[in-house]
Regions:
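S-adenosylmethionine
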Residues: 1-119
């Protein structure tokens, strides 16, 4: 159940787009992970990861996986080969377009997914 106060605030902010926003809550959730390019090349990653992955269109190293795969239990996750992250969270760094040598202060860096993506 979505709190009434939140619904009212979102309706005020979104106007005509509010109904589409609400419909999003009735759709299935997407699950994704992000490959760590500092740890493994894409070709090797796709050959070694035991899941059927589909690219996240807006995230250079992002992939959708099936919920039942549970990649958080695989040793690659613990080794930092990939990071489990919401696909929408990946878009933030992609749109930021950080260039080498630039510095970024992530004021909301917990647990640090976007920070590792910037690295």
């Amino acid at each position: 159940m979505i709190p009434q106060e939140f619904q009212e605030r979102m309706q005020q902010m979104l106007g005509d787009e509010y109904e589409a926003f609400l419909q999003g809550y009735d759709k299935p959730r997407f699950h994704a992970l992000r490959r760590n390019p500092l740890k493994i090349e894409e070709k090797d990653f796709l050959e070694k990861v035991p899941y059927e992955l589909k690219p996240v269109p807006w995230a250079q190293h992002g992939y959708y996986y099936k919920h039942e795969d549970q990649p958080g239990k695989h040793p690659f996750h613990e080794a930092g080969v990939y990071y489990i992250q919401e696909p929408s969270a990946m878009s933030v760094v992609e749109y930021l377009e950080v260039k080498p040598g630039e510095q970024v202060l992530d004021l909301c860096a917990a647990p640090g997914g976007k920070t590792t993506q910037i690295a």
